[in-house]
Swiss-Prot record:
UniProt GO molecular function: ATP binding; metal ion binding; methionine-tRNA ligase activity; tRNA binding
Protein name per the record: Methionine--tRNA ligase
Cofactor(s), by name: Zn(2+)
Any one cellular-component term (Gene Ontology): cytoplasm
Domain of life of the source: Bacteria
Chain's role: Is required not only for elongation of protein synthesis but also for the initiation of all mRNA translation through initiator tRNA(fMet) aminoacylation.
Known partners and oligomeric status: Homodimer.
Annotated motif 'KMSKS' region, positions: 301-305
The record's free-text note on cofactor binding: Binds 1 zinc ion per subunit.
Protein location: Cytoplasm
Short sequence motif named 'HIGH' region, residue ranges: 11-21
Main location class: cytoplasm
Length: 656
């Protein structure tokens, strides 16, 4: 049996879990169930990261010891995953003695190999990210030095430190990613990583003396003032939990096929530091690093100061665990940022779950009972519905193919296309008419086709919505097991069936208006409504345009707006807002345009996008870079969106 490892990041215990943590962990649980059903022996690992300066500070504010504080928050994470019925095999804490032993032994190995040396570090330290920022990449704003990753203020520090020779692994890392093009998904994230490596890697500070709450160095180092840097400590959890260098039950056979699920904010640590550490320790590198985006709340980034951080457990208690799983995994393409709203959640529940799937099963059970006393033979399906059977199998196979590519939203979209297809087939064939016309053989073939297809679909649905899938399969007296997966889903074997009633899969949520009223009350409580009314009042007070505000058609014609195709996109050093774009305007060269959209768009996501460009704007220098045009965009409150043609156009096409 093939062994594999699926991990979440270990979650930092400076705060309680929110919907972002739940999203990551639900993805991992989905993959665990998917690959287990296919016969793999999967080890699903999660846990908590409990060392570092932030934990020390948070504990001090609460008059607790760091360990007592970590105990309380770690328990909240574990309880939440138990509430969601997540099928994890290991829950690791970096305060576990076995983990400490692994980290100290790994440190010794790397030191003896010559990959760790002692020196002095001077630089801008970000407490939030627990890392130093390269001086060339910090953002100097109003005499404050901001972290390029989180934009928080940094502190200039100088301290003695041990360093890991990260620079020695530039070439091996690039070779690894060249040989393994799908090692990071989505692929544009891999391009982002290799671009970063190609700029040159600095050796990495891996110990601290400025705080005490961390794993001490091995005793033989005889250097008690140092503790291990949080990222070396944290990343080694993926190995320590499997018994590496610590005497625990050895499960390292799982390690060779590791899939790490991470958010885009910790991509660099997992895609550069982690494989370099593994190379130093002569351990196999991961199979895949799966990188997801962030969740916003109704267009606004989650923030404690705004009071819009969502508790996934409370949402699940209100709308259902399975329903929330479906929404989070279906609503947004994996890798991209997604926006959460209760209204969208309710619409998904009512339309997709209750209407498309729930009502379909109810209709089938009702007709099977009425016309055949629940007993359906499959012998005539191929005689009456060969094309429909082939199409159903094709849709299911397509849905299944998206999961290994980490296109989970497409897998669910295609899976629910099956239910749409079957509902339309019922409407087209009108089984009540077949019954009226005494075409019982054809009617039985139709209902048996629907029953067999629903049963087959339950084996793919299981990964995403396990309880609903088991309930669906129970209507056909079948259990969800690896053996039955082979028989019903993989082999697509048609079955004679005796159906049975089951409790409804889902319940419709009534009165969306009521939800909107609740949300309005919540907004008023947060003061958002008052701000909106103030802005609206200000807008109304604006005077209508006078004749002096108008421009003539001749003036407008002076502005040359063209369709542009973005060919390249890069960040500009020392700026957290500007991107350097190379744009095709149908000329014999690419135009360089400097655009202030870096806070809203990742560079890699822009390549290949059509945009609208003011092409005859006078060239100007921004941050020492020449800009030969302007990309048009629209801003709504804090959200910025590029203006693009609704259909593909030839680069250089004039907009009029």
């Amino acid at each position: 049996m093939q062994k594999s490892l699926i991990t979440t990041p270990i979650y930092y215990v400076n705060d309680i879990p929110h919907i972002g943590h739940a999203y990551t962990t639900l993805i991992a649980d989905t993959l665990k169930k998917y690959y287990t059903l296919q016969g793999e022996e999967v080890f699903f690992l999660t846990g908590t990261d409990e060392h570092g300066q932030k934990i020390e500070q948070s504990a001090r504010l609460r008059n607790q010891s760091p360990k007592a504080y970590a105990d309380s928050i770690s328990a909240i994470f574990k309880n939440q995953w138990d509430f969601f019925n997540l099928d994890y095999d290991g829950f690791i804490r970096t305060t576990d003695s076995e983990h400490q032993k692994c980290v100290q032994n790994a440190f010794e190995i790397m030191f003896e190999k010559g990959d760790i040396y002692k020196g002095t570090y001077s630089g801008y330290y970000c407490v939030s990210c627990e890392s130093y920022c390269a001086v060339s990449k910090v953002d100097n704003t109003d005499s404050k030095v901001l972290c390029p990753d989180c934009l928080r203020e940094t502190t200039l520090l100088e301290e003695e430190s041990y360093f890991f020779k990260l620079s020695a692994y530039e070439k091996p890392l690039l070779e690894f990613y060249a040989k393994n093009p799908e090692a990071i998904l989505p692929i544009y994230r891999k391009n982002e990583v290799t671009s970063f490596i190609e700029q040159g890697l600095l050796d990495l500070s891996i110990t601290r003396t400025s705080f005490e709450w961390g794993i001490p160095l091995p005793k033989k180092m005889n250097d008690p003032k140092h503790v291990v840097y949080v990222w070396l400590d944290a990343l080694l959890n993926y190995a320590s939990a499997l018994g590496y260098l610590n005497g625990l039950d050895n499960k390292m056979a799982h390690f060779e096929r590791a899939r790490h699920i991470v958010g885009k904010d910790i991509l660099r640590f997992h895609a550069i530091y982690w494989p370099a550490f593994l190379m130093s320790l002569n351990l196999p590198l991961f199979k895949q690093l799966c990188v997801h985006g962030w969740w916003t709340i109704e267009g606004v980034k989650m923030s404690k100061s705004l009071g819009n951080v969502l508790d996934a457990q409370k949402l699940a208690m209100e709308y259902g665990i399975e329903e929330l799983r479906y929404f989070l995994l279906r609503e947004v393409p994996f890798g991209q940022d997604g926006d959460f709203s209760k209204k969208a959640l309710v619409e998904r529940i009512n339309a997709n779950l209750n209407n498309d799937l729930g009502n379909l099963l109810n209709r089938l059970l009702g007709m099977a009972k009425k016309y055949f006393n629940y007993s359906l033979k499959s012998t005539k399906i191929t005689a009456y519905y060969p094309k429909e059977l082939e199409k159903a199998h094709q849709i299911l196979d397509n849905a299944n193919s998206f999961v290994p590519k980490m296109q989970l939203h497409k897998a669910l979209e295609e899976l629910f296309n099956i239910y749409d297809f079957l509902n339309k087939l019922i409407a087209k064939e009108e089984p009540w008419v077949l019954h009226k016309n005494n075409e019982s053989e054809k009617l039985e073939a139709l209902l048996s086709l629907i029953a067999n297809t629903l049963l087959q679909s339950s084996f793919l649905l299981y990964a995403f919505m396990p309880k609903s899938a088991m309930k669906l399969a129970s209507a056909f007296r079948v259990e969800i097991t690896p053996n039955n997966y082979e028989r019903f889903f993989k082999a697509k074997k048609l079955q004679d069936m005796v159906l049975q009633d089951t409790e409804p899969l889902f319940s419709k949520i009534e009165k969306i208006e009521k939800i909107e009223k609740i949300e309005k009350i919540e907004k008023i409580e947060k003061g958002e409504e008052a701000l909106a009314e103030k802005a609206e009042k200000k807008e109304k007070e604006k005077a209508p345009p006078t004749q002096e505000n108008y421009i003539s058609i001749e003036d407008f014609k002076k502005v040359e707006i063209k369709v542009g195709l973005i060919k390249e996109a890069q960040r500009i050093e020392k700026s957290n807002k500007l991107l350097r774009l190379k744009v095709d305007l149908g000329e014999n060269r690419l135009r360089q345009i400097i655009s202030g959209i870096a806070l809203d768009y990742e560079p890699e996501s822009l390549v290949g996008q059509m945009v609208c460009v003011v092409a005859n704007l006078k060239p100007a220098k921004l941050m020492g870079e020449m800009s030969e045009g302007m990309i048009l965009a629209v801003r709504d409150n804090d959200n910025l969106a590029l203006i693009s043609p609704t259909r593909e156009k030839i680069a250089g096409s004039l907009i009029s």
